[in-house]
Amino acid sequence: MKKTTGFYPSVQVDTAPVSAAGSAGGVLLTTAAEVTGLSPAMARALDGWRKPAAVHHPAKVLTDLAVTLALGGDCLADAAVIRSEADVYGPVGSEATISRTITALAADAHRVLKQVAAARRAARAPAWALAGERAPTHGVTATDPLIVDLDATLITAHSDKEEAKPTFKKGFGFHPLCAFVDHGPDGTGEPLAMQLRPGNAGSNTAADHIQ
């Protein structure tokens, strides 16, 4: 292993007789974040929310949580999965540090979300450039346009949460509106944006789709 200037170590595979690293599949995500410039873009975007004496950058905390979710986590405490693999994921904040960071960012949620969205847009361009013919924009024409799928998806909340409401399916939770770019018949949808909405939001609310 050798350190990089980004958030995550550069990991190399060898055949040395050492213990295996759990959750190593997340390296695909951390490598993508570094190669596309997402990590430095996030760092610049959220630098204003970093306290002078802070050890863990807010952007690193958020990207760690994104990796945790991808590895199957469903709460902040599940970041322990990657915290135990410091050689693979670098220093990961404690549960208390993560909680304080999220609380601080949530206090200025509108600006934070705007900054994160800008960082993601900045990283998407090099990602699609590296994808070449597999990029969703490859071969797009007026007669073969890029398709963006808007989908309202119900997410169940198993306990009382902020903005969790009864849904039209007689459940309880959230009803975000998601935008995915189509990768064609052999690919999957790539999330472009998501509008967070309470569970009682409509599936075909015109104002939400326009926004």
Where do the language-model regions lie?
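Dynamic "connector" segments at or just before major functional cores
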Residues: 1-202, 207-211
